[in-house]
Amino acid sequence: MNYTIDTVVAISTPPGRGGIGIIRISGKSVPEIAPKLLGKIPNPRKAEYLPFLDTDGSILERVIALFFPEPNSFTGENILEIHGHGGQIILDILLERILKTSSDIRIAHPGEFTKRAFLNNKIDLVQAEAIADIIDATSYQAAKSASNSLQGIFSRKIYIILEQLTNLRMYAESSIDFSEDEISIIPYEDIKKKLRNIISDVQKMYKSTYHGVLLREGIKIVIAGKPNAGKSSLFNALVGIDRAIISTISGTTRDTLHEYIQLNGIAFHITDTAGLQKKSDNEIEQIGMKRTWEELSNADHILWVIDPNDVTNKENDITLKHVEKVLFCKNKKTPITIIHNKSDLTKNQIGISIINNYTIITLSALFNDGTDLLQEYLSNNIKSKIQQDCKSNLSENQGNFIARRRHLNALEKSSKYLFSAQTQLLSTMSINELFAEDLGLAHKELSKIFGKFTPDDLLKRIFSTFCIGK
């Protein structure tokens, strides 16, 4: 079904000079517009070299034209693509000429071509988002994973869960309808088993989706520890520039600093923080420590930096245990790696060891000695974790997929309703309306991933982040 009545046009290539410039037109008026511009309607799905005509019939440009009749096109509508020279002036001239050919043609909004593809059921909302994620990818792994999402890997896994949930809802509703007749549509134990399997699948999918979010947004690494432990030196060494001021004076860093790096195709967001201590009478230091706690609460991985002079100091252990306690209370199991810094002073051997279930890396941040070991450890650790958590959900040849926070929220809400349904089922030992209602709410939350039951303002916000011409 075609949801649009007007025709839209936009330059699809980036602004500026280039070898080729592309203009895309989509809508019902394309067959009417094409002869005015090209003297004919190009043969479907075949590249044709044609003159691009002005209003008086003179040739403005010679172009390659491609015509895709509805419904077999990206948007599901008639599409005409004009491939000409890549100068901005000539593209603007061609665009102005196109806008004069019909009264119902207008400039496309950002992401409108992709939105039309979604509205015309050519792609689902996850695939639409994957298109934007491919364009915006900041690492090789993110681009590859976004491509997997575009191919439908993520969508297929969710659709399977939705199908299972639909069948369970059908059994539940039927059992309720025939309860007065004492007709058992499906045994109670079978219902319980099916629900348990769905909950398990949703939880596995949540893990995989979480790592899909990390691949899209980047892994948040927070560097923390006591004042003057060498946190800023480590930050500078990891990001490759002297971004943070370093000094022997305790408490030099008062605010958080953020930088982005790539390690083996994975995006990392490195954050330097103010030092943590038991107490401080300095108001600025107090604000800095408050921000450090905020960063730690949102970290995907923590690097806890220790000054060699404080290794035997119990305050380091007390502060670290306090960090772990706070994170535990917030239901966060953030991995922590301990960094024994300043090996240039202690002459300790650079390397990796495991002590009391902590991974400990000895290095010299100031002299950038051993930081390559840390970088390799971080990238390998993240890759291993992603592969391990996704292994039960995806076959080896499928690979990872990209995901967004809203997908996580939908899975989390759906899981809560499923657990509520399970509680209802086990407590009453029967299939009732409350059980069926929880299943319906879980189904609705999962369906939001694909744009069903999704508010128009959210759809508008999603597509507004796209490029014009996409």
From Swiss-Prot:
Cofactor(s) the record lists: K(+)
Broad EC category: hydrolase
Assigned EC number: 3.6.-.-
Disulfide linkage: none
Residues in TrmE-type G domain copies: 218-383
GO MF terms, alphabetically ordered: GTP binding; GTPase activity; metal ion binding
Major localization class: cytoplasm
Cell compartment(s), UniProt: Cytoplasm
Residues holding Mg(2+): S232, T253
GO biological process, one term: tRNA methylation
Keyword terms: Cytoplasm, GTP-binding, Hydrolase, Magnesium, Metal-binding, Nucleotide-binding, Potassium, tRNA processing
Chain positions recorded as GTP binding sites: 228-233, 247-253, 272-275
Residues bound to (6S)-5-formyl-5,6,7,8-tetrahydrofolate: R24, E81, K122, K470
Residues binding K(+): N228, S247, I249, T252
Job of this protein: Exhibits a very high intrinsic GTPase hydrolysis rate. Involved in the addition of a carboxymethylaminomethyl (cmnm) group at the wobble position (U34) of certain tRNAs, forming tRNA-cmnm(5)s(2)U34.
HAMAP family, sorted: GTPase_MnmE
Family, similarity comment: Belongs to the TRAFAC class TrmE-Era-EngA-EngB-Septin-like GTPase superfamily. TrmE GTPase family.
Name used for this protein in its record: tRNA modification GTPase MnmE
